[in-house]
Amino acid sequence: MYRVSKVLNNNGVIAIDMDENKEYVILGKGVGFGKKVSQRFDKPEGCTTYRLEQETERGSAKELVKGIEPEYLEIADAILTESQKVFGDSIDRGILFPLADHISFAVARIRRNEQISNPLTEDIKVLFYSEFKVAETLKTILRERLQIESDDHEVGYVALHIHSAIGDEKVSVAMQTARAVRECIDMIEKATGKPIDVLSLSYNRLMNHMKYMVARASTGEKLNLDMNEYMLDQYPQAYKVATDICKNLE
């Protein structure tokens, strides 16, 4: 049994679980319709609950929700629902609040005709492919609900939030990984004097190798694979570039 502490809109309320004495955001079609403060109710079928007593990367959920319009909570909830269809119960829906906060700022930027450029967008597409595909639902949702158009740069940022929800990894860490991989790619292109075709299979393979290399470097994990002498003998230029990349990561 819940008790309403605040009605957000027809599709959302903030309510206290009377058994746990903890506060939640409850989202679902019609869950707030006709509700009054202090009214008691059972959670309807198909609703999602989000605990307010938690800390997020952007601060307290309880403080965050005060500055977020309910429609952005609904949009974030819809994206997380799509994420759960792909990634199952491994998705941490607790990222609702920072995700909704990000979407709120993104919409404000779009409405002011402020274009943001994320230099890592193409890398994020490859590094976090599945997350990016789910995040693309942002475009459809914003078009249908708010009649505004978003681009791949905004989708890329949402993809990082989804990745954070899957791997219990901060968005800033995912961004750091993408940035480190981009630096490695830049070093390869500079050393070879040739750009890498981002649409090629080789690029996809290289990006994924780089991603796991960066992840291992950040945790101190070492590979039990000794091919150094062979690679130095057979591919000296490639070996030198790889050595420089590893030194740069340190």
Over which residues does each language-model region extend?
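A cross-family "folded-core" feature that marks the main globular domain of proteins
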Residues: 1-250
